[in-house]
Amino acid sequence: MRLYFYLTLTLQTFTFGANPHPVPKITDLRKPWVFARANEASLLFIEPQHKNSEPYAHIIQSGEKLQWFEFNGKDALIWDVTRFTETDKELTLYLKGGNKVIFTPYWDIDHCLLIIRFTPEASYNPTRFAIPYQYLKSLPYEKAEE
């Protein structure tokens, strides 16, 4: 499956600009993802783990509100994904509460979905977290209208 890069929320918009050049492969562990800050929020795409290792972080939990958990000693905010749609140009994750996250353009990845990270107090090095790809595959899927 492929994933996209411009990250948008419906209530507040944060932009993560991806380089149009080829993105590092999931197995290339030497190249860290780019760190960006926008609107006092931190967004990070983490280094992928080796294909045969455990997922890097926690699976999203259920619940109506955005949830906090502690990872590597720091607070991180995770989104509650309920379903997703996909076109040739973007991937949309729908969140509880009506918000959605849109990624564009995306890269080939086979075991781990992205890796979104958002911390309101964005002045420090944020906490990493990932959404395992197997979890994404278990969500209701709809082919979006082109």
Go through each PLM region and give its residues.
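Classical Sec-dependent N-terminal signal peptides that target proteins to the secretory pathway
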Residues: 1-20
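A generic structural signal for ordered secondary structure
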Residues: 3, 16-17, 32-34, 75-79, ...
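N-terminal helix-cap/turn-to-beta initiation motif at the start of protein domains
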Residues: 19-36, 61
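Short, hydrophobic/aromatic-rich segments at coil-to-beta transitions
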Residues: 28-33, 63-67, 87-93
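Short polar catalytic/cofactor-binding loops
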Residues: 36-43
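N-terminal glycine/threonine-rich, aromatic-flanked beta-hairpin/loop signature
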Residues: 43-87, 131, 136-139
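Beta-sheet ligand-binding and adhesion/scaffold domains
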Residues: 55, 89-146
